[in-house]
Regions:
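Loop-to-helix entry region of an early transmembrane alpha helix in multi-pass inner-membrane enzymes
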Residues: 79-82
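Hydrophobic transmembrane alpha-helix bundles
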Residues: 42, 69-77, 114-120
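Hydrophobic residues within beta-strands of alpha/beta enzymes
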Residues: 31, 77, 107-109
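N-terminal beta1-alpha1-beta2 module of alpha/beta enzyme domains
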Residues: 1-71
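Flexible, glycine-rich active-site loops centered on histidine and acidic residues
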Residues: 2-13, 84-120
Length: 120
């Protein structure tokens, strides 16, 4: 069994490198970075509650995971999830391949369309 953690990295959260080093020291296997490039207004999709501030402020997952790759040796890096329908296909493929290369093959590419109908 492997253990990982997912976080919305923001300018007010722990830094990606700090968290990743602490996770690696404690035996975690992976860190997952969320993605929300924007939150549409108005939102037609109902949520159980108001979205937290982190949804609006989350950093780019490829940037944060590159910081993680540079600070760690074995921790797997994952997008959880990359909203591929909101991204340019060629640029996203290049980002994913670059991160995998920089990390020494530790990148896990989690993809999806998201849950918020207005983002799709």
């Amino acid at each position: 069994m492997e253990f990982g953690a997912s976080i919305f990295f923001t300018d007010y959260s722990i830094t990606p490198a700090e968290l990743a080093v602490a996770m690696e020291e404690r035996g975690f296997d992976s860190v997952w970075a969320a993605e929300h490039s924007h939150i549409p207004v108005p939102r037609r999709t109902r949520a159980d509650s108001e979205l937290g501030k982190r949804y609006y402020d989350v950093m780019d997952p490829f940037v944060t995971l590159t910081a993680v790759a540079c600070a760690t040796k074995r921790l797997k890096l994952a997008t959880g999830i990359c909203l591929v329908i909101q991204r340019d296909t060629i640029q996203t493929a290049k980002l994913a391949a670059s991160l995998d290369q920089v990390s020494g093959g530790r990148f896990l590419f989690g993809i999806g369309g998201g849950w918020n109908q207005d983002e799709i």
